[in-house]
C-alpha cells in the first residue's frame, strides 16, 4: 500500500511539472515540506488521510481554459501569470490567440491556469508572426526614453519594451488595447515618458484614454494605484467616443475578508526579523524617512501595495497575531489581495508566488475596464 501511495504522489507531482518544493508549498505543508514530499515518494513515511486527499484533489486541469468561441481575438503581452487575461476571460467575450512571457516560473503558473504555454521573449518575436487580433493587452516596465524631448514619437521608443508593444500595434492594427502601469508613469522623467507613449499611440491612429484607479475602490482590500491606458483604432472603431471608464464601486473593504482561517507557523516572523523591522522603523523615523513595516489586522480597511519584493521580508504587509510576532500573508492571501478567485492554481514555491502576485494586476479593476472596452466594441 505504501508503494502505491508513493507512486501516486510522485506521478501526480511529475505530471504537474512541479518540484518537490513547489508541490509542498502548493499543498500548504510546513517549512521543510519538500523533505516531507521526498520521504513520501520514497515510501519512508505516509501522508495522513487529509494530506493524501490534498494530493489527490490538487487540480491537474486548467480552471480557465481559452474560450475559442469568444467574439474578439486577443493577445496578452508581458503576460506574467495572466491577471489581465483573467479579467477579460470573465467577460466571456475573448479568444486568446497569442501570449508572451519570458519568466519560466510565471509561464508555469500561466500554463497551469489557462492551458496555454506563453511564447518567450517578445523582443525576439517578429510582429508579422503574431496572429491577427482585435484586442491587445499588456503591461511594461516604466523606463526613460533615451531621446526624450526630440520627436516624441514612435522612433524615440526604440530600445525599450514599450517599443515592442508599439511595433506590434503598428503592424497588426488591433481595434483596441489596454495597457497597465505604475501610477508614477504620469510624472516619470518630468512627464516626458508618458508624453512620448501617448504621442506614439496617437501617431499610430489611436484615440487614447487614461485614468488612475485604486484596487481598494473595486472590492479588494489593497491600496494599489495604477494607471490604465485604453486606446481605440480611429478607423475601425468609429464610436470610440462612447467609451467611458468604469465608476469605482468604493464599497467598504476589510483585510479580514482575505485572510485564511488557519495559517502555518512558517509565516510568523522570527524574533530576529521582527526586532530588525522595529529597529529600522525607529531609525528611519529619526531620520525623517517614512519607510517602515506595515502592520494590519482583520479590521483594517486595506493593506499597502504588495510588491514583487514581498518574498524578501514581507515588511510592507504584516498581519497582527495575538500573543505572537506578526506574520507575512500567505501566497493564497496575496492572490486574494489582487482579486484572483480561490480556484486559481499556485503551482510554484512561496518565493515565486509572492513575486508573481506582486508583479500582477488587480483582476477586478481589469474586469471592470474590460467590460467597458467590450461594450464599446459591441456597439
From Swiss-Prot:
Cleavable signal peptide: none
InterPro entries referenced in this protein's UniProt entry, alphabetically: C5-MTase (IPR050750), C5_DNA_meth_AS (IPR018117), C5_MeTfrase (IPR001525), C5_meth_CS (IPR031303), Cro/C1-type_HTH (IPR001387), Lambda_DNA-bd_dom_sf (IPR010982), SAM-dependent_MTases_sf (IPR029063)
CDD domains, per database record: Cyt_C5_DNA_methylase, HTH_XRE
Catalytic activity field: a 2'-deoxycytidine in DNA + S-adenosyl-L-methionine = a 5-methyl-2'-deoxycytidine in DNA + S-adenosyl-L-homocysteine + H(+)
UniProt domain SAM-dependent MTase C5-type: residue ranges: 72-379
Active site (record annotation): 142
UniProt keyword annotations, A-Z: DNA-binding, Methyltransferase, Plasmid, Restriction system, S-adenosyl-L-methionine, Transcription, Transcription regulation, Transferase
A GO biological process held by the record: methylation
Pfam families cross-referenced by the UniProt entry: DNA_methylase, HTH_3
PROSITE patterns assigned to the protein according to its UniProt record, in alphabetical order: C5_MTASE_1 (PS00094), C5_MTASE_2 (PS00095), HTH_CROC1 (PS50943), SAM_MT_C5 (PS51679)
Alphabetized GO MF terms: DNA (cytosine-5-)-methyltransferase activity; DNA binding
Occurrences of domain HTH cro/C1-type (ranges): 9-66
Enzyme Commission number: 2.1.1.37
SUPFAM superfamilies, A to Z: lambda repressor-like DNA-binding domains, S-adenosyl-L-methionine-dependent methyltransferases
PANTHER family the UniProt entry points to: TRNA (CYTOSINE(38)-C(5))-METHYLTRANSFERASE
Similarity section: Belongs to the class I-like SAM-binding methyltransferase superfamily. C5-methyltransferase family.
NCBIfam families with a match to the protein in the record: dcm
Protein name: Type II methyltransferase M.SsoII
Source organism per UniProt: Shigella sonnei
UniProt lineage: Bacteria, Pseudomonadati, Pseudomonadota, Gammaproteobacteria, Enterobacterales
Gene designation per UniProt: ssoIIM
Amino acid at each position: 500500500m505504501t508503494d502505491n501511495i508513493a507512486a501516486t504522489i510522485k506521478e501526480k507531482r511529475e505530471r504537474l511539472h512541479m518540484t518537490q518544493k513547489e508541490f509542498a508549498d502548493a499543498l500548504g505543508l510546513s517549512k521543510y515540506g519538500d523533505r516531507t514530499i521526498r520521504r513520501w515518494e520514497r515510501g519512508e513515511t505516509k501522508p495522513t488521510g487529509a494530506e493524501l486527499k490534498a494530493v489527490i484533489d490538487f487540480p491537474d486541469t486548467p480552471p480557465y481554459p481559452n474560450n475559442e468561441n469568444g467574439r474578439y481575438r486577443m493577445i496578452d503581452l508581458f503576460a506574467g501569470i495572466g491577471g489581465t487575461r483573467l479579467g477579460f476571460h470573465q467577460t466571456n467575450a475573448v479568444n486568446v490567440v497569442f501570449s508572451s512571457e519570458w519568466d519560466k516560473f510565471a509561464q508555469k503558473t500561466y500554463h497551469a491556469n489557462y492551458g496555454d504555454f506563453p511564447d518567450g521573449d517578445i523582443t525576439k518575436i517578429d510582429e508579422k508572426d503574431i496572429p491577427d487580433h482585435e484586442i491587445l493587452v499588456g503591461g511594461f516596465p516604466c523606463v526613460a526614453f533615451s531621446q526624450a524631448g526630440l520627436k516624441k514619437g514612435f522612433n524615440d521608443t526604440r530600445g525599450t519594451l514599450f517599443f515592442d508593444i508599439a511595433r506590434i500595434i503598428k503592424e497588426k492594427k488591433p481595434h483596441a488595447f489596454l495597457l497597465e502601469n505604475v501610477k508614477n508613469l504620469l510624472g516619470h522623467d518630468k512627464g516626458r515618458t508618458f508624453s512620448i507613449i501617448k504621442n506614439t499611440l496617437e501617431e499610430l491612429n489611436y484615440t487614447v484614454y487614461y485614468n488612475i484607479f485604486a484596487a481598494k475602490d473595486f472590492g479588494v482590500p489593497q491600496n494599489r494605484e495604477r494607471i490604465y491606458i485604453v486606446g481605440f483604432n480611429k478607423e475601425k472603431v468609429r464610436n470610440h467616443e462612447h467609451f467611458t471608464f468604469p465608476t469605482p464601486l468604493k464599497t467598504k473593504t476589510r483585510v479580514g475578508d482575505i485572510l485564511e482561517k488557519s495559517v502555518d507557523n512558517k509565516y510568523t516572523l522570527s524574533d530576529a526579523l521582527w526586532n530588525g523591522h522595529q529597529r529600522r522603523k525607529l531609525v528611519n523615523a529619526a531620520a525623517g524617512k517614512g519607510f517602515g513595516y506595515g502592520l494590519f489586522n482583520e479590521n483594517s480597511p486595506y493593506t499597502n501595495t504588495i510588491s514583487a519584493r514581498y518574498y524578501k521580508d514581507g515588511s510592507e504587509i504584516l498581519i497582527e497575531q495575538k500573543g505572537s510576532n506578526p506574520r507575512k500573508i500567505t501566497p493564497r492571501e496575496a492572490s486574494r489581495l489582487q482579486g484572483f478567485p480561490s480556484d486559481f492554481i499556485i503551482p510554484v514555491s512561496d518565493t515565486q508566488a509572492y513575486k508573481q502576485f506582486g508583479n500582477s494586476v488587480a483582476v477586478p479593476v481589469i474586469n471592470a475596464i474590460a467590460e467597458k472596452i467590450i461594450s464599446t466594441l459591441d456597439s
